[in-house]
Amino acid sequence: MIIGAKFITSLVKFDENLSSNFSEVAFLGRSNVGKSSLINSLCKQKNLAKSSATPGKTQLINFFEVTCKRNEEKFNINFIDLPGFGYAKVSKNLKEIWNQNLDEFLKLRTSIKLFIHLIDSRHTHLEIDVNLNDYLKRFLRPDQKILKVFTKCDKLNQSEKAKLKNEFKDSILVSNLNKFGLDSLEDIIINQTLGLDK
């Protein structure tokens, strides 16, 4: 279980000198899909990860050191809150710079063990999400895993949840509002970063 967390630093772009002694979990998704809210819910801190009211305004890679406990043993991992993607209100040139920075970061950051791809449960087949999943698969290493996490599931009825889970069998459905699915997600994060989820 997660028992504590603190903010470490923010980066504008990939810095190969910022090494990590811990396994890392990267949170990716469209703007306003709920990345920061999910990190706050998992870490049980309301304002740990800050979300911007203006999509695309904050384009930083944010690092958080997370303390976990398993069988009385404590260990640390890093959560990485990546910039959201898919905004309409920024220039093409700025998008290209962001994409280049993220591409370099995701491919070269070998300490990342789990990519959590957040998808709005009401919009499950958007082209931008399909493209992200295909992109991650192209450079995924044997010690890495992609996990689809469908957010805002409190807005679905039971039938819609069952249909979604049936279509995406290895996914997790969560709601930051009523804390649905967070315990299951926490278990996967801990097992994957410890190398137990084979």
UniProtKB/Swiss-Prot annotation:
GO terms of biological process kind: division septum assembly
Pfam family, one: MMR_HSR1
Residues given in the record as Mg(2+) binding sites: S36, T58
Family in the record: Belongs to the TRAFAC class TrmE-Era-EngA-EngB-Septin-like GTPase superfamily. EngB GTPase family.
InterPro entries: G_ENGB_dom, GTP-bd, GTP-bd_ribosome_bio_YsxC, P-loop_NTPase, Small_GTP-bd
Cofactor requirements of the protein: Mg(2+)
Cross-referenced PROSITE patterns: G_ENGB
GO cellular component: cytosol
Keywords linked to the UniProt accession: Cell cycle, Cell division, GTP-binding, Magnesium, Metal-binding, Nucleotide-binding, Septation
HAMAP family xrefs: GTPase_EngB
Annotated ranges, domain EngB-type G: 21-195
Domain of life from the UniProt record: Bacteria
Species of origin: Campylobacter jejuni subsp. jejuni serotype O:23/36 (strain 81-176)
Binding site for GTP: 29-36, 56-60, 81-84, 151-154, 174-176
Disulphide linkage map: none
Signal sequence bounds: none
The protein's name in its UniProt record: Probable GTP-binding protein EngB
